[in-house]
From Swiss-Prot:
Keyword match Ligase: yes
Native source species: Macrococcus caseolyticus (strain JCSC5402) (Macrococcoides caseolyticum)
Positions contributing to ATP binding: G108, S109, H110, G111, K112, T113, S114
Family: Belongs to the MurCDEF family.
Enzyme nomenclature, EC number: 6.3.2.8
Xref: InterPro entries: Mur-like_cat_sf, Mur_ligase_C, Mur_ligase_C_dom_sf, Mur_ligase_cen, Mur_ligase_N, MurCDEF_pg_biosynth, UDP-N-AcMur_Ala_ligase_MurC
Pathway given in the UniProt record: Cell wall biogenesis; peptidoglycan biosynthesis
UniProt GO BP: cell division; cell wall organization; peptidoglycan biosynthetic process; regulation of cell shape
Name of the protein in its database record: UDP-N-acetylmuramate--L-alanine ligase
The entry's keywords: ATP-binding, Cell cycle, Cell division, Cell shape, Cell wall biogenesis/degradation, Cytoplasm, Ligase, Nucleotide-binding, Peptidoglycan synthesis
Cited Gene3D superfamilies: Mur ligase, C-terminal domain (3.90.190.20), Mur-like, catalytic domain (3.40.1190.10), NAD(P)-binding Rossmann-like Domain (3.40.50.720)
Record-level Gene Ontology MF annotations: ATP binding; UDP-N-acetylmuramate-L-alanine ligase activity
Substrates-to-products reaction catalysed: UDP-N-acetyl-alpha-D-muramate + L-alanine + ATP = UDP-N-acetyl-alpha-D-muramoyl-L-alanine + ADP + phosphate + H(+)
Cellular compartment(s): Cytoplasm
């Protein structure tokens, strides 16, 4: 039996893929840095071994799956090559894996993880669907007909995939350490559409997506009347958001999602469109949509005393704005307190003023030091450069989280793609 060894198993995509292979009966282990990540708990609960990086982890007969963050000079990858083992990059392995299913890629600059989670949940309401979500969640179901997966545009990794369908949520400038400009980002998505086999489902309210050209049908969804699939008559209730869906100008049905915010309705429209194209039972789709509980680190809520604590992955100005708007919609009577940790110096520099403007939607802002990525450990920029752009913003770390106690009955949101969770944990552990 093949033993799959994951180099960088704690990465969100890597851990999800490890779950999938394990669920399908494969033997799986992996290695990573010793720092704790939110993906670890579920891996360990399945009995999947997680080792610290060491070339001695690599043995004869293993198949190596390497995370995209680790170069060929990594000690374990070097050792694998010395032993003549097959080393496959995450995105290449995933590209080959999906060929056995009717596959749906979910991509876009924002909203990939939430939409993939929703898609997998809703499709499973009618058809067996295996899935890989960017929150570290994955499920390999024997006998699955469908495979729903998150496809990241970073470094054009999504060009390794040839899915049957693709959902594109939006196109926005991000990853300034790789993409040179907005046109560079657009060109990457344009390249990706050429790899899709059956159809593209895209947000027609996004002007950039209207410029996409494809040799297959593009089904546009959104709030504007010129889309094929349109959401109308939205109503916000304590239970979520209700909306009507029109297809080609005709009322299709009324749906309810437990989520809040325009972006959540757009995500739902994308999923409804895919299910409609594939002929899934609409009653099952409606029920599943109404029972969606969200995904990890995307508006993940818990109650502590009188406060609502929210953990969210938002790390781009567009995402921060959407998260804060959702909080105000769901809890209109409460103050919203934002604790934000910028992720990467390059992104912070590129979007400095945009970060400041989006964070101003909060009633109070606290900032953490910038979190550098594996590829970028330092920069000339400091968190003070962002702080001065936000009136009343203060700095916070694990030693002064008691500052948050003063906001009785508030919504306290911890946002970022780094290790912002350590701030929330420190706050929750206050005596």
């Amino acid at each position: 039996m093949t033993l799959y060894h994951f180099v960088g198993i704690k990465g969100s995509g890597m851990s999800a893929l490890a779950h999938i292979l394990f669920d399908m009966g494969e033997t799986v282990q992996g290695s990573d840095i010793e720092k704790e990540f939110f993906t670890e708990k579920s891996l360990r609960e399945k009995g999947i071994t997680i080792l610290p990086f060491n070339q001695e982890n690599i043995k004869e007969g293993m198949t190596i799956i390497a995370g995209n963050a680790f170069n060929d000079d990594h000690e374990e990858i070097v050792r694998a090559h010395e032993l003549g083992l097959t080393v496959t990059r995450y995105h290449d392995f995933l590209g080959n894996f999906m060929s056995q299913y009717t596959s749906v890629a979910v991509t876009g600059s924002h909203g990939k993880t939430s939409t993939t989670g929703l898609l997998s949940h809703v499709m499973n309401g009618d058809k067996k669907t295996s899935y890989l979500i960017g929150d570290g969640t994955g499920m390999g179901m024997p006998g699955s007909e469908y495979f729903a997966f998150e496809a990241c545009e970073y470094r054009r990794h999504f060009l390794s995939y040839s899915p049957d369908y693709a959902i594109i949520t939006n196109i926005d400038f991000d990853h300034p350490d790789y993409f040179a400009s907005m046109s560079d980002v657009f060109n990457a998505f344009q390249e990706m559409t050429k790899k899709v086999k059956k159809a593209i489902v895209a947000c027609g309210d996004d002007e950039n997506l209207r410029d996409i050209e494809a040799d297959i049908p593009i089904y546009y969804y959104g709030f504007k009347e010129d889309n094929k699939v349109v959401a109308k008559n939205m109503k916000t209730t304590p239970q979520g958001t209700q909306f009507e869906v029109y297809i080609d100008g005709e009322l299709f049905d009324t749906f309810v999602t437990p989520m809040y915010g325009d972006h959540q309705v757009l995500n739902a429209l994308a999923v409804i469109t895919i299910c409609h194209l594939e002929g899934l039972d609409n009653a099952a789709v409606k029920h599943a949509l109404s029972t969606f509980g969200g995904v990890k680190r995307r508006f993940s809520e818990k109650i502590q005393d009188e406060q609502i604590l929210i953990d969210d992955y938002a790390h781009h100005p567009t995402e921060i704005k959407a998260t804060l708007q959702s909080a105000h919609l769901k809890y209109p009577e409460r103050k919203v307190i934002a604790i934000f940790q910028p992720h990467t110096f390059s992104r912070t520099s590129a979007f400095l003023e945009d970060f400041a403007n989006s964070l101003k939607l909060a009633d109070k802002v606290y900032l953490c030091d910038i979190f550098g990525s594996v590829r970028e450990d330092s920069g000339e920029l400091t968190i003070g450069d962002l702080q001065i752009l936000i009136p009343g913003a203060e700095l916070i770390n694990e030693s002064n989280v008691n500052l948050l106690k003063q906001y009785k009955d508030a919504v306290v949101i911890f946002m970022g793609a780094g290790d912002i969770q350590k701030i929330q944990v420190a706050y929750e552990n206050l005596k």
